[in-house]
């Protein structure tokens, strides 16, 4: 997909702040610092629309990015960052649950994981959380460029096994650094962003 226009519309903390234009939405979930912002930036060919940070826990709101005036990427707070207070984590959890449970325009969730490592218990819980709400899920295994080519399939198979992925769910190895997996990601997303 060629992206001609991309902008952040709002950083929301409750549903009364969500955009009201009824465009389809794709949520992006994953651990803190796993590469959700880099994934967005690579897909839209921008360096800094979604701000990246070496400091985990940067995203603390639901960030709505309108793409080509036709759909939204919604970056949700990362999970698994120990230095965030329990109270703050609970607040994020309620905010995300409200979004996943009530948002009619939410079409699918992209779960971003680090392909170099086995999915964490938090990744497994998020996958199960998404499945509980009966939402389509696409797993993106980031940092593909950091794994030697002869070990990639082993890492992919292991991630699928640890997540106990449904056969119908898609797993896409991805590198924000070199763009590998970008076309496959757009292809998978395209079925959910048509009105």
From Swiss-Prot:
SUPFAM superfamilies: P-loop containing nucleoside triphosphate hydrolases (SSF52540)
Binding, GTP: 30-37, 57-61, 75-78, 142-145, 174-176
A GO molecular-function descriptor: GTP binding
Pfam family, one: MMR_HSR1
Family label: Belongs to the TRAFAC class TrmE-Era-EngA-EngB-Septin-like GTPase superfamily. EngB GTPase family.
Function recorded in the entry: Necessary for normal cell division and for the maintenance of normal septation.
Protein name in UniProt: Probable GTP-binding protein EngB
Protein source organism: Oceanobacillus iheyensis (strain DSM 14371 / CIP 107618 / JCM 11309 / KCTC 3954 / HTE831)
């Amino acid at each position: 997909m060629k992206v001609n226009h991309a902008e952040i519309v709002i950083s929301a903390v409750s549903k009364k702040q969500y955009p009201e234009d009824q465009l389809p939405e794709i949520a992006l979930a994953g651990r803190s610092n796993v590469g959700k912002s880099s994934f967005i930036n690579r897909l839209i060919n921008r360096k800094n629309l979604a701000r990246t940070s070496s400091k985990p826990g940067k995203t603390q709101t639901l960030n709505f990015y309108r793409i080509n005036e036709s759909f939204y990427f919604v970056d949700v707070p990362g999970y698994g960052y120990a230095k965030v207070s329990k109270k703050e984590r609970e607040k994020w959890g309620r905010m995300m649950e409200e979004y996943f449970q009530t948002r009619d325009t939410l079409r699918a969730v992209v779960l971003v994981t680090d392909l170099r490592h086995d999915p964490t218990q938090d990744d497994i819980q998020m996958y199960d959380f998404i499945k509980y709400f009966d939402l389509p899920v696409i797993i993106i295994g980031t940092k593909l460029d950091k794994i030697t080519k002869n070990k990639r399939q082993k890492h992919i198979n292991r991630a699928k096994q640890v997540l106990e992925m449904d056969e119908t769910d898609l797993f896409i190895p991805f590198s924000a650094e070199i763009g590998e997996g970008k076309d496959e990601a757009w292809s998978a997303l395209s079925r959910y962003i048509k009105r």
